[in-house]
């Protein structure tokens, strides 16, 4: 018996959300992406669209122009240069987009209820905890309860990667046959991955530690 497609997924086009989309594809009716004015939005969104089409999942891109216009973050086109280094270094905090996941989950909740969907998937993971407060379990738990209480049909948020690492996610993706060269991570949003910003460093380490050949094209 085929499982009911009763879920939507917030998908950026990066390793984590693409992996989750493949893992939960049997239940996903809608893939939801956001154009919020980040330096790497265009690069990410092309891969989100690619994988949604490949899986036969409807894909929506919702503009959140106000974030790029009014919020402060070096991740945004309106911000400064992307710092280089690991996620846990102090300078990477400048890439935080305030309450980004909260805003996206709120929009996703309204859309899920409008579509009669019961579940939202989001692919935050343990490696995000160091600098992104809206990726931590301490945020996801109360946000889940708020969405459940604030929707008529009790929409649920499921964040199954919250307590696992990007290396763990890479292993899941490898078991699903995902080609990670068809995902985007780099915050700089250039032609190639820079290889030295926090998300590039994490990507390289995750693939290496998972024993997966890294076919990503890096600058230099």
UniProtKB/Swiss-Prot annotation:
In the record, what terms sit under GO molecular function?
Answer: ATP binding; ligase activity, forming carbon-nitrogen bonds; zinc ion binding
Q: Where is Zn(2+) bound in this sequence?
A: 186, 194, 197, 200
Cofactor-binding details, from the entry = Binds 1 zinc ion per subunit.
Q: Which amino acid positions bind ATP, per UniProt?
A: 11-21
The superkingdom listed in its UniProt entry is Bacteria
E.C. code = 6.3.4.20
Please tell me whether the keyword Disulfide bond is annotated for this protein: no
The Swiss-Prot or TrEMBL record lists the needed cofactor(s) as: Zn(2+)
Q: Keyword set for this entry?
A: ATP-binding, Ligase, Metal-binding, Nucleotide-binding, Queuosine biosynthesis, Zinc
Against InterPro entries, the record matches this protein to: QueC (IPR018317), Rossmann-like_a/b/a_fold (IPR014729)
Catalysed reaction(s) here are: 7-carboxy-7-deazaguanine + NH4(+) + ATP = 7-cyano-7-deazaguanine + ADP + phosphate + H2O + H(+)
The annotated pathway is:
Purine metabolism; 7-cyano-7-deazaguanine biosynthesis
Broad class of enzyme this protein falls into: ligase
An example GO BP is: queuosine biosynthetic process
Q: Which SUPFAM superfamilies match?
A: Adenine nucleotide alpha hydrolases-like (SSF52402)
Does this entry carry the keyword Zinc? yes
The family assignment reads: Belongs to the QueC family.
What is the role of the protein in this entry?
Catalyzes the ATP-dependent conversion of 7-carboxy-7-deazaguanine (CDG) to 7-cyano-7-deazaguanine (preQ(0)).
Query: Mind telling me which PANTHER family this protein's record contains?
Result: 7-CYANO-7-DEAZAGUANINE SYNTHASE
Tell me what this protein is called.
Answer: 7-cyano-7-deazaguanine synthase
Which species is this UniProt entry from?
Porphyromonas gingivalis (strain ATCC BAA-308 / W83)
